[in-house]
């Protein structure tokens, strides 16, 4: 996984390993797609990293997001795991990662279960996970699950040495 476009502020670049830490720590991602008409579209999604790929879900397959990915599977997901506005300095401390790749609908039942589990473990760990897994089993057929094969991954941060400790 490499960066395909040069980063302007190389001094703020973080390693691929640290970009994965950002992804695993973020509460959500923003998925960017482009429709067949060339119009961009971005929407928040619950995403999870598992075995080198990203998974996210939607409530139904017929949506602008799904139509865009069917027409053009190239997507980008932006994750922000930390942000703190520093008004007096006219800046923001942040930790972010951008993953670019191709999105494909997951149809294999074993992979669908794996994806649901990864999403539940990422976003509902602890005492709530059983409730969410039961929901996934009950409602799983009505949810569209997508896999993103990562083609490039980059991360960027202002104040990474301090933020890194806070991410764990």
Describe each region flagged by the PLM.
Residues 2-11, 82-168:
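Charged, gly/pro-rich active-site loop segments
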Residues 2-30:
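Short, basic/aromatic recognition patches
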Residues 11, 20, 54, 64-67, ...:
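Anion-coordinating catalytic cores for phosphoryl-, nucleotidyl-, and glycosidic chemistry
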Residues 16, 62-63:
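Structural motif corresponding to alpha-helix initiation and N-cap regions
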Residues 23, 68-69, 119:
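A generic structural signal for nonpolar/aromatic side chains embedded in well-ordered alpha-helices
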Residues 26-61, 77-78:
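Short beta-strand segments
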Residues 27, 43, 50-52, 71-75, ...:
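A generic structural signal for short beta-strands and their flanking turns/coil linkers
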Residues 64-88, 92:
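Helix-adjacent hinge/juxtasegments
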